[in-house]
Amino acid sequence: MLRTITPSEMKRVETRVMRETSITGEALMQNAAAHVARAVRRRMAGRAGLVVCLCGTGNNGGDGLAAMRILMEENPAFRGECWLLPGRLSADAQRELDRLTEAAGSPPRVAVHRIEGIFPIPEKVACAVDALFGTGLSRPLEGAARTACEALQALAEAGVPVVAVDIPSGLNGRTGQAFSPCVRADRTITFQYLKTGMALGDGLDVAGEAGVADVGFPAFPEDVF
């Protein structure tokens, strides 16, 4: 039976993985990004245009940046845009941004921008990636984050497939409450365990086709949860 856990339980498991094993945060991010990249490839099959990734400043954004680099390195014809929320990036997200910009070349095959004011939705988008927020969100989005979420909504309404990283942004990962706005994904790649909010309330609708990706956690006894 598929295990479902809360965001706080997931945090405890991640802490234990980092403390008791040789698995690094960097390795977990690369594993997660590879699963996201695979989902994007499948969603954009037969579709021409850019892949647009909207990224938060935390590790969810880092997963998105790493996935875009993987897609670019796999396909010389790949073109994309990454749009970052304002603010300082986490150390892992900054590392992935540096790797992406170094690999992108000049002119860059994946352009990187900051979201300021109105988000200019590009034309001919083949697939969009929601890497704004992870499972810890507990209140409605505001400011640039709200603008970014509304842009993803507009792309979805225009028929662009949206892949969400770990959980759709705007969805409470514990209760399944969808705040307004909330990304409606075609496909959600969540990591290691299904989050309770994806199996409750609005989560059953907005997460789309949910896939649980193994990012390399060892098996733990029940008392870790």
Question: Where do the language-model regions lie?
Answer:
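YjeF_N-associated NAD(P)HX repair module
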Residues: 2-5, 125-225
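Nucleotide and nucleotide-moiety/phosphate-recognizing core
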Residues: 37-134, 140-165
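Short, solvent-exposed coil/turn linker segments
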Residues: 24, 114-117, 172, 218
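Small-residue (G/A/S/T)-rich helix-start motifs and N-terminal tracts that mark the onset
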Residues: 1-73, 77-85, 185-188, 193-225
